Amino acid sequence: IASAPDFTEDLMWAKFDEVTKNTLLKDGIYYEPTEYDEQPYTITLPLIEDGRTHLVLRDKLGINVPIRLLHGMSDADVPYEVSLRLAEHVISDDVEVILIKDGDHRLSKSKDLMILTAQIEKLLCPNLKSD
């Protein structure tokens, strides 16, 4: 759901301005305002550095199982193209990317949850007929 592999490098570090990067390098910590909470997110230099040791979208991923990626096209935090990139990097042929046009990052609307539930049911019970 709204997959964000490599987010510390591609969605944080690469998009931080020089002031933010310098704050992290100097102080080891940066507070990122968020619309989801009154308190900002705490981003630390160790988080960024650790993320660099776990990058997965630089090579093929040896994952060969059924995969369903759900992503909102109105996600302001993680572009839906990240899910498309992830789908391209796994070796599995059984990959579906489900884009929800009005879906946001949380995909928490009733309609979104119904889509999620249906995908889980299809994966767990592939022989059941759906409506």
Positions of predicted regions on the chain:
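Hydrolase active-site cap/lid region
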Residues: 1-43
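Cofactor-binding loop segments of dinucleotide-utilizing enzymes, especially the Rossmann-like FAD-
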Residues: 3, 72-74, 102
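Active-site nucleophile elbow and catalytic-triad environment of alpha/beta-hydrolase enzymes
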Residues: 40-60, 65
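Short beta-strand/loop motif that positions the catalytic acidic residue
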Residues: 62-63, 69-71, 75
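Short alpha-helix in the alpha/beta-hydrolase fold that links the catalytic acid
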Residues: 65, 79-88
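Acidic catalytic loop of the alpha/beta-hydrolase fold
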Residues: 74-78, 105-106
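Catalytic histidine neighborhood in serine/cysteine hydrolases
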Residues: 90-106
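Catalytic active-site module of serine/aspartate enzymes centered on a nucleophile-bearing elbow/loop
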Residues: 103-131
